[in-house]
Amino acid sequence: MQEKYNFGKVSSQHKNYSKIETMLRPKGFDKLDHYFRTELDIDLTDETIELLLNSVKAAFGKLFYGAEQRARWNGRDFIALADLNITKALEEHIKNFQKIEQDMGVDELLEYIAFIPPVEMNVGEDLKSEYRNIMGGLLLMHADVIKKATGERKPSREAMEFVAQIVDKVF
């Protein structure tokens, strides 16, 4: 039986837009939770997983906005993989993700949270083919920051917000 999970989606049927629509957890959600708990020794709650995924999406979006500017500076009308500000740390996390992605089993979850940020330029095929790896690398980067910056096995909401601030400063 799938559990209900609140992703903060506002129901269009309600006139009161402060009401939140509850939806089923996306596939891969439980696998991410299991992997973080058993392999990374990080115990996340539904709330902290939601904060984690929102932070990953925010970092992904920030990468794209900077890449759009670099593409313009380079005289291109599309964003290429080379335009992304892939730091050495993120590159290492992407490589680690590629080694363990089968063990994590989060492909469906990454597809669910993957999105093209609202940029004005087209996205090159080389970059589109790397979405999953970049998102997976960002997940592992967040896990690394959780362990090193907070030292908490079960991070609180405040700890997750702190982690999001640290990752945000990287990009």
Curated annotation (Swiss-Prot):
InterPro entries referenced in this protein's UniProt entry, alphabetically: DUF1931 (IPR015207), Histone-fold (IPR009072)
GO molecular function, one term: protein heterodimerization activity
Pfam families (UniProt xref): DUF1931
Positions in coiled-coil regions: none
Cysteine disulfide partners in this protein: none
Family: To A.aeolicus aq_616.
Name of the protein this chain belongs to: Uncharacterized protein aq_328
